């Protein structure tokens, strides 16, 4: 299944354009993101999160699913028609996954977006690791993940579409404290020796 990650930056220019043209923004949103448009191109939201509260460089992150590449291309043409890039400063990644998203059932989740960079140093460390060492490391990760009550929502391979990133995904935590505990465990495991990642916390947008 095809997924698109959209990461919206807090850009003073585009923020000003949005503030000065609310009617045009509304029309563009209806054209690009209405239920009718989504139904036409087979688009569905997976997550749509506010992130400014945790990192003021970024306003929002969202992941959509598409039925196929032609559907993504057709929807992208609508996005261009709406001149959407005048108002939103975006980083986008495409990825694929064989699994359906698994949204958490607990209330008020904290979502963590992660984007795994293609980093030669971490790739070299992974290459030196034996299968036994890798299995032991992931077992520790799994123990921490379960202990704090986290849930894996989605992971997508994206290297085929953008060689800067190997993949992206989303984890869900029941609280900020749970995320802090998991991050502490990762530091103690020296996890950053094996993966270089950009991460961002968000809460579901109402």
Q: What positions do the PLM features span?
A:
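Short S/T/G/P-rich N-terminal loop/turn motif that feeds into the first structured element of a domain
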Residues: 1-58, 63-77, 84-166, 172-184, ...
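Accessory, usually C-terminal, subdomains that scaffold auxiliary metal cofactors
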Residues: 192-193
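C-terminal structured interaction module
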Residues: 196-197
């Amino acid at each position: 299944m095809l997924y698109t990650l959209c990461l919206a930056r807090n850009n003073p220019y585009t923020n000003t354009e949005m503030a000065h043209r609310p009617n045009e923004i509304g029309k563009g949103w209806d054209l690009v993101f209405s239920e009718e448009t989504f139904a036409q191109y087979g688009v569905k939201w997976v997550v749509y999160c506010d992130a400014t509260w945790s990192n003021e460089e970024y306003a929002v992150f969202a992941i959509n699913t598409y039925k196929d590449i032609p559907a993504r291309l057709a929807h992208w043409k609508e996005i261009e028609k709406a001149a959407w890039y005048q108002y939103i400063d975006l980083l986008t990644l495409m990825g694929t996954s064989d699994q359906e998203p698994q949204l958490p059932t607990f209330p008020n989740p904290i979502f963590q977006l992660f984007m795994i960079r293609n980093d030669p140093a971490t790739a070299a460390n992974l290459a030196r690791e034996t299968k036994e060492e890798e299995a032991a490391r992931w077992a520790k990760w799994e123990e921490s993940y379960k202990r704090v009550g986290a849930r894996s929502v989605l992971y997508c391979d994206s290297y085929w579409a953008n060689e800067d990133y190997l993949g992206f995904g989303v984890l869900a935590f029941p609280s900020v404290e749970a995320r802090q505990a998991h991050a502490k465990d990762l530091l103690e495991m020296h996890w950053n020796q094996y993966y270089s990642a950009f991460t961002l916390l968000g809460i579901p947008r109402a």
